[in-house]
Amino acid sequence: MAASELYTKYARVWIPDPEEVWKSAELLKDYKPGDKVLQLRLEEGKDLEYCLDPKTKELPPLRNPDILVGENDLTALSYLHEPAVLHNLKVRFIDSKLIYTYCGIVLVAINPYEQLPIYGEDIINAYSGQNMGDMDPHIFAVAEEAYKQMARDERNQSIIVSGESGAGKTVSAKYAMRYFATVSGSASEANVEEKVLASNPIMESIGNAKTTRNDNSSRFGKYIEIGFDKRYRIIGANMRTYLLEKSRVVFQAEEERNYHIFYQLCASAALPEFKTLRLGNANYFHYTKQGGSPVIDGIDDAKEMVNTRQACTLLGISDSYQMGIFRILAGILHLGNVEFASRDSDSCAIPPKHDPLTIFCDLMGVDYEEMAHWLCHRKLATATETYIKPISKLHAINARDALAKHIYANLFNWIVDHVNKALHSTVKQHSFIGVLDIYGFETFEINSFEQFCINYANEKLQQQFNMHVFKLEQEEYMKEQIPWTLIDFYDNQPCINLIEAKMGVLDLLDEECKMPKGSDDTWAQKLYNTHLNKCALFEKPRLSNKAFIIKHFADKVEYQCEGFLEKNKDTVYEEQIKVLKSSKKFKLLPELFQDEEKAISPTSATPSGRVPLSRTPVKPAKARPGQTSKEHKKTVGHQFRNSLHLLMETLNATTPHYVRCIKPNDFKFPFTFDEKRAVQQLRACGVLETIRISAAGFPSRWTYQEFFSRYRVLMKQKDVLSDRKQTCKNVLEKLILDKDKYQFGKTKIFFRAGQVAYLEKIRADKLRAACIRIQKTIRGWLMRKKYMRMRRAAITIQRYVRGHQARCYATFLRRTRAAIIIQKFQRMYVVRKRYQCMRDATIALQALLRGYLVRNKYQMMLREHKSIIIQKHVRGWLARVHYHRTLKAIVYLQCCYRRMMAKRELKKLKIEARSVERYKKLHIGLENKIMQLQRKIDEQNKEYKSLLEKMNNLEITYSTETEKLRSDVERLRMSEEEAKNATNRVLSLQEEIAKLRKELHQTQTEKKTIEEWADKYKHETEQLVSELKEQNTLLKTEKEELNRRIHDQAKEITETMEKKLVEETKQLELDLNDERLRYQNLLNEFSRLEERYDDLKDEMNLMVSIPKPGHKRTDSTHSSNESEYTFSSEITEAEDLPLRMEEPSEKKAPLDMSLFLKLQKRVTELEQEKQSLQDELDRKEEQALRAKAKEEERPPIRGAELEYESLKRQELESENKKLKNELNELQKALTETRAPEVTAPGAPAYRVLLDQLTSVSEELEVRKEEVLILRSQLVSQKEAIQPKEDKNTMTDSTILLEDVQKMKDKGEIAQAYIGLKETNRLLESQLQSQKKSHENELESLRGEIQSLKEENNRQQQLLAQNLQLPPEARIEASLQHEITRLTNENLDLMEQLEKQDKTVRKLKKQLKVFAKKIGELEVGQMENISPGQIIDEPIRPVNIPRKEKDFQGMLEYKKEDEQKLVKNLILELKPRGVAVNLIPGLPAYILFMCVRHADYLNDDQKVRSLLTSTINGIKKVLKKRGDDFETVSFWLSNTCRFLHCLKQYSGEEGFMKHNTPRQNEHCLTNFDLAEYRQVLSDLAIQIYQQLVRVLENILQPMIVSGMLEHETIQGVSGVKPTGLRKRTSSIADEGTYTLDSIIRQLNSFHSVMCQHGMDPELIKQVVKQMFYIIGAVTLNNLLLRKDMCSWSKGMQIRYNVSQLEEWLRDKNLMNSGAKETLEPLIQAAQLLQVKKKTDEDAEAICSMCNALTTAQIVKVLNLYTPVNEFEERVLVSFIRTIQLRLRDRKDSPQLLMDAKHIFPVTFPFNPSSLALETIQIPASLGLGFISRV
């Protein structure tokens, strides 16, 4: 693309600047090829002429569009170059306070030098399980990606953290390890993750120090491998260390410190255990005072010492070993204070009894003289002899320092080995994630051996990094099948060869170290001779012969040769080491030096796999022939090279992830960005190299759909095809002519660097042109509108002026016209009056004359008409008379003629009738004649009828005309009379008119007078009325004001009291909720510890019961004992479950619940305290009313109960006495009155009497119960029964009892029983049975009517609901209802069948009993009675009907069937089948009915065992299927129902208010199960928490996709295209959830809970928790995703929330508190949509966002990103204003909401109206071994 197309007017470029590195400027005119100068304008408004380089003609780099500024990924920038990268990092760091940014596969982390709240556990949970491209850049995102790729690809991972000292490498590595420890639990050993984290404070204390650049700088490199098992849980870790900076032990530069551990020891010197170390202030010791900065601001070394010791203890370092470590460290400090005195130039000595050396020897346990001798001497060995040589003071000091460094290095390695042993696991490692905390590229004014090794390591790492980046780039191209060429990138291999190849720098250094007289100078000369002018990367400084320069990938570095050989050899005298090894009092010291040679050997690595790199070879005193070890000759450089090769092999075998830490400034100022320092580090850490590699290929990638959506504005309508891919191709070919600038892949379009910016420029130009056109149109419209407004104003003025003139002229014309009209009307009146008189006279004459003529004419016409009528009638009469006469004559003639003809014919017929043939012929003719005659008769009849009708019509017409003529005559006569009267009337009226005119004139005169007086009176009256109204209004106003004041005061007082009461109530509720939450958290913690205890116990059993030969046994991991309960929410439990299920279970002894109950005492006290608080609150609210209600309600109920109990007790006692007396008297009477043979036992009469007596006794018991029930009802329902009836009933009962007693006293009981009583009893029993059957039938009919009514209501409701549903939902609802109806009918039929079966079985059983009794009776009679006696005394058997006993709502089972009951009812029960086919809560009812029977039997052991087994069974089911929502919901519902049953039937008054009398009879009588209710309540809380976890696990994957990512409102894009975001995840989305998915899941949850019969209040709490999870997860992701913070996304979120609110309304759950949990999300969405410019906007935001914390508000404003370039970003000054306004707000500094928070749950008492005695046990449950009682 030509430069002239890009470098146009308004284009922005970057130009170099000495201060800011790069400055932004804008072109003032287009660039043309050949121009030497660019006309620019800087951002501050200064114009500048920028001269181009005449040689290269290189133009300044272009600036990216504003829409790309602040991107999460640097490679998403269209122009990829240094200034763009620097500017993007600066904007994110300074403006948005974002310290993390992606650069391809690299995470760039800038040290903020400030504590940020972005590393808490809530942030870890937010990033856990998320795709890397979905969240904002973070170290946790990199760690999650590594963890996910390890689990998915089953490949080891590495996280390489590098950067300068002080850039934050150690902190980043520490947070990465913390993330792994948090998201994955330990597999076998306890607290493995805690041990991994505990290694950090130990390694920081012994390996970190304060430098000029960093207060906590790591002075060694480390690679930590975190091991995972097959389930990807942490099982251990392993650490490798690299190149410890030992020189810091003996020397520190200005403003630096030694290692932290020394200062921690000095700060803790006052501790009693440290007295023996004889430490003091750090300034006392030579090794800690050289830097002059012993204290770090904000760091307490004493506290850090405590943390270090705690970490050592956690890692298994015993107190004795810890004290040994501290003794060695203290000895090093004292050794540094040892001073030497010179004897001469070649010898020195230590003063006798030198205190520092004495302390050192005491601490080390070595001989003072021996150590003092070898510090001042050394042993030399030749081929023939060995001799001791004194050394100078300088050499002695160097030897002392070398010894101190060697001791510290060995101690460091020992601690590392011990840490590795503590982190080592016996479980086989499946995979690992390595975290490499390595030093970055370093260059100082003086660079020595340490910087050389560091830069060498960075060259190797950079080479590996370049290859990995290149590989990923090419894989993407190959995947999309686009042609690509080899990308040229910087190759580090030449530099690496210069360092490590044969005859390289390290090789020559090692060779020089082997030379007896080798020196730094000779080594430098060898380097010059070998590489100078032969290797382009090697140079020699101009002014030095003791230095060399290497061109590294980042920069040129000049190394000083001085000290290279000494540091490479790192020699320490062996005699000093032998003295330390000889220590007998100190066990740790010899351990540091034992097997030193073995430790150095690469073939004898430590068990942890660590490669020790800082071991120092010990120089032997004498080289023995044949035993010279090559391992002792290995130098530090050689060891480092080998370890680096091992490290690279490890990294190459893993998938690397890169973190580059940047130090923003050298002064540690928070959020201060130094461009110069940042550019240096960006060049050194490879970020710019990544940019260069990306820029060489196709850095910008767009999907076809995104490209089409973004650049649709550049297309014409004819270019848009149905095939989006082809459309994009056609458009690109027109927009970008150079086809090399883009490539078409399978799913994406790849662009070269700068092409997206070019397209954005074209798009912006197009939109700018459109905007200009819109502006032109709008401005024209505004000017037109202004002109029209002015024109309308002018016209209005003209109209008013002309109107005034016209009105004046109109007034003149009106007056003139009025005068003319008055004249006209006056003249017209006179003329009209004269004319009217003449006209009236003429009309009157004409009327009279015309009337006279008309009357004459009328009379003549009337006479003529009457004459014609008379003539007509006369003529008609004459014609009729003549006709009748003629007709009569004709008929007579015809009759005569016919008579004659008939006679003749008769004669013929008589003759013919005598022959048969004639008769036949006649017969045939007669038939035809008869038919013809009949036809003629019919015709004549018809004709007669028609003539008759005509005659009638003529008569009617005649009569009508006659009446009409009569009326006409009458009317004419009347008209004549009226005309005469009118003439007379005219004359009289004329006279009256004249008279009235006079009266009218008088009346008009009077009227004027009256009107004048009335107007005056009216005016006065109106004035008076207005004055009265004003006074009345004032009085009303005053009255209203006073009333308003009184009302306001009353209202204010009321509101104050209500507000105070509400505040107190809220405070009490908060305290109650806090206490409840604290208790439930403790319960949750107890469950977790219990789970942990069970797991450890199972593991211990598993370890103990190792299979032996010939005997195979596997312990169960599922225990059936006690109250074990676990929540399987992690991947580890889910994967462990199949393994546990396969193992056989082993029965254990049941838990004694008394132990668990003792643990609940504290819980009971807390509940009582909460109850007292609640009671106090209730008393404050409704004290008077509630007290009065209680006084009215309690006495009658309590009195009725007491009366019933006392009556029952008295009746029982009296009946017992009566029955005893009766039996005695009866036996006595029988003995006295009957013969011995009759009354002997076994006799028939005796048996009959005894049977009758038994029957009567039973009947009396029945009567007694009826009387007691009646009496209790009379006492408790006095208002329903009249006193008189009460008295009669009681009297009747008393009389009945008195009669019975009299009969007993008289001795007539036998005859009464045999006679009358028997008859009465039979009649009463028959009557009772009939009455009962009638009542049952009536009750059944009522039940059927009620059920039919309910069914009708349900059908009507269903019909109403169906009419509101769409057709598909209507069909589905109808089917569901039909299924429910059929199921209920099926259940009813099953119940009826069961009842009938039971009745049949009962009848059969009674038949068998009766048959058996009859058989026994017959046998007894045959044995005891002779035949004669049988004949003489026949005994008639008496049929005694028994009353069938009602069910008592209990279930009986045997003790040995308890486990079977738990197994069938709990363990193997399928919730779905029970919930669909049976009544809700059936298992709970069954269990309670079993408890009732055990209580009825007074068997405490049975009650305890059943309840314990039930609780354990429920826990076992939830442990086995705890991740199934239906199972958890089912048992939560049943547990609550079981708890409610225990309360409802406990017998406590508070729970019996809603019971029926029958239900009160079912209350428990022998046991108080209040403690078990507490246990069940705790169990319900645990199940509820498990239910919440299951809900969370199901909803979690849906929330972000459905609430944030899915575009619910079509046409409104809430996020940028991925082409602008660039960063994508390594894992493709498996499925996209929408808001409908969430709502469908909510519907599923709600329907399942309703189906299980869960309490409505509990459902509301579950829904509230679900909505809290949705709101918290959505808000947390919003706060961590910059791409989601836009205006359109806020609108999408608000719409989604409204849909959730609509769901709440549909389910009638708006009062559940769920909507309030969404308030933070709603306010966040509103914050994205409101204006964010002025102070008024800031005030509105502060008042609106009261549910968001200050941190959240500021975070949203910082993250706000416009979706397109026409939106404005939030200014930094506006954010500062918000912070100032919210400064006084007291809220949590926490950024994210706690998505794991669970609201405290309560279980309000919900009694059941279901009668226990009506519950049937379905056969499908397999509970045939229990029976109803």
Swiss-Prot record:
Residues 8-60 form the Myosin N-terminal SH3-like domain. Residues 644-666 are annotated as: Actin-binding. Residues 1508-1784 form the Dilute domain. The modification Phosphothreonine is found at T1734. ATP binds at G163, E164, S165, G166, A167, G168, K169, T170. One of its GO terms (cellular component) is filamentous actin. It comes from the Eukaryota. Residues 916-1239, 1315-1419 form a coiled coil. InterPro entries: Dilute_dom, IQ_motif_EF-hand-BS, Kinesin_motor_dom_sf, Myo5a_CBD, Myosin_head_motor_dom-like, Myosin_N, MYSc_Myo5, P-loop_NTPase. Residues 1117-1131 have a biased composition (Polar residues). Residues 1137-1148, 1170-1196 have a biased composition (Basic and acidic residues). Residues 767-789, 790-814, 815-837, 838-862, 863-887, 888-915 form the IQ domain. It catalyses: ATP + H2O = ADP + phosphate + H(+). Keywords: Actin-binding, ATP-binding, Calmodulin-binding, Coiled coil, Golgi apparatus, Membrane, Motor protein, Myosin, Nucleotide-binding, Phosphoprotein, Repeat. Residues 599-635, 1106-1148, 1170-1199 are annotated as: Disordered. GO terms for molecular function: actin filament binding; ATP binding; ATP hydrolysis activity; calmodulin binding; microfilament motor activity; minus-end directed microfilament motor activity. It is found in: Golgi apparatus membrane. SUPFAM superfamilies: P-loop containing nucleoside triphosphate hydrolases. GO terms for biological process: actin filament organization; cellular response to insulin stimulus; protein localization to plasma membrane; vesicle-mediated transport. Processive actin-based motor that can move in large steps approximating the 36-nm pseudo-repeat of the actin filament. Can hydrolyze ATP in the presence of actin, which is essential for its function as a motor protein. Involved in melanosome transport. Also mediates the transport of vesicles to the plasma membrane. May also be required for some polarization process involved in dendrite formation. May be a homodimer, which associates with multiple calmodulin or myosin light chains. Belongs to the TRAFAC class myosin-kinesin ATPase superfamily. Myosin family. This is Unconventional myosin-Va.
